[in-house]
Amino acid sequence: MTRTRVEAVHIVWITAGLGCDGDSVSITAASQPSLEDVILGAIPGLPRVYLHNPVLAYELGGDSFMTWWYQAERGELDPFVLVVEGSIPNERIKREGYWAALGTDPATGQPITTCEWIDRLAPKAWAVVAIGTCATYGGIHAMQGNPTGAMGLADYLGHGWKSWAGIPIVNVPGCPVQPDNFMETLLYLLYQAAGLAPMIPLDDLGRPTWLFGRTVHEGCDRAGYYEQGDFASAYDSPKCLVKLGCWGPVVQ
């Protein structure tokens, strides 16, 4: 962890994993805080934020957009937070071509794979965040029989991996991610970068504890029916749905 205050933080967001870009779309619906409030500096105490997301940066394209990636690789965007969206394919088992890539190498004209970008940028990132179930756990692409060998970011980098600032991989699952969950996590990291918050608290799965420390059941408005043993027998009932397959008492 670093206590040195920073004036600006870049968010370098890779959407080139195996995914649907649903997490990028989801965060546009965030409200506590909203993406606009964070980027426009409406929240007191935050450093200036520059977002580099290929899905949301519709005014830029091609080589002009990739400039930020090359600058991050050269250490010119310091500090930056690396956000990874989509599961990570195993390029080592791909005999020809590639599974996923973002941009091309200026020297060779060849695509730069998602794995290469992670290898280049993760060691230089102040913090690394996996957004969505695909990036955190591999998602549906990690099912048995998928030829890509897809995996979550922690499986790729290692579950004990930490950034140069000593921050473990931060996992914010969801399909798509619940927008406020991600924005709250990003907000905490920005306050930490500003020296206004301690190390982000994470559970044993790398998730923020204040978001995933309790079960869904604990916050459910049907929990009173559960305590009374009054369970629904049909999905249109307002009563507890645990007998119909709800995993709320288990899922965090």
For every predicted segment, state its role.
Residues 1-252:
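Iron-sulfur-associated redox domains of electron-transfer enzymes in respiratory
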